[in-house]
Amino acid sequence: MRYLVSGKEMKLLDQNTSQVFHVPELVLMEQASMAFVQKLLLLKQNKLSTALIACGSGNNGGDGLAIARLLREQGVFVSVWQAGEEEGHRTSSSYDVQKQICSAYSIPVVQKEKVSAGEASYDVVIDALFGTGLSREISGELANDIDVLNQLSGWKVAVDIASGICSDDGAVLGTAFRADDTITFSFGKKGQYLWPGNEYCGKVHVVSMGITQESWLDDKPHTAVLESEDLKKLPSRMAHTNKGSYGKLLIIAGSVNMSGAACFCAKAAYRMGSGLVRVFTCEQNRLILQTKVPEAVLVTGQENEEETLLAEQLQWADAVVFGPGIGTGQRA
């Protein structure tokens, strides 16, 4: 089971780690950046020569600056585009520290004109413009900056989340970076798994930045994604049971020329473990249902007797599914 968090929950975890457990914000930033670089190089099997890192003016941009320095240590020729500063946005204190370090190491800085002109090509384009705290629409020059990044060739990777994607619901806030991969910290974010955010974030890789379970304090994550490993936790069926031990499901589905919905619904019912399945449908669907789902019991009748038949079936059933392919006519 993979737990997912919202932007607000992630901010709270950061704060708890810094304020309750006294881990400085800059230490968390360094650990996040190191984990990002390790994963990035692993994904490309250390075959990266050039990288462009586009940095916003907040902590996500600070991550980007640290990533640039760490990639340079690994022999990658890096260029930093300080997009947030270019557009006149106020910088965070951690960003300022990382900028000073990059300046001391003489890490190359490129301007928007050079990036948009396509004067250089990059093996990887790294998006560190906006993080999970974004809640406003991106507009103006910063929206144009994202469009410039999207037009570049090369492998595109987002830091924590694709810029412009709401971490809570996956909405596009004006415009968004289109990543091939996203390397996110500590937990997956809800918006990375919901449409359309999942299309912009690409494949999501979760790495540790040093935030532990203790940072939840008295709270806990509320959202999770089930994985194939979780299926092993489901109880096996006992040897002395039969199909009647696993519930009786009545499916009221299908109409003339709409037999497919009833078929798919019956198959899904068996797939999820229903014991006895009856399909209440019109007589015209008999042949295809008995051919496609022979294990289901078929119940049909003439119009003048359907009401009585349906009442009997409702008494029999433990649960009822109503509606797939039922149509909008008088019979429905």
Predicted regions and their residues:
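Short secondary-structure transition/capping segments
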Residues: 91-94, 122, 169-171, 289-292
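Small-residue (G/A/S/T)-rich helix-start motifs and N-terminal tracts that mark the onset
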Residues: 1-84, 92, 181, 192-332
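Short, hydrophobic beta-strand segments that form beta-sheet elements in well-ordered domains
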Residues: 108-112, 156-159, 184-185, 278-282, ...
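Nucleotide and nucleotide-moiety/phosphate-recognizing core
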Residues: 37-129, 137-159
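A generic local structural motif
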Residues: 110-115, 142-147, 168-171, 193, ...
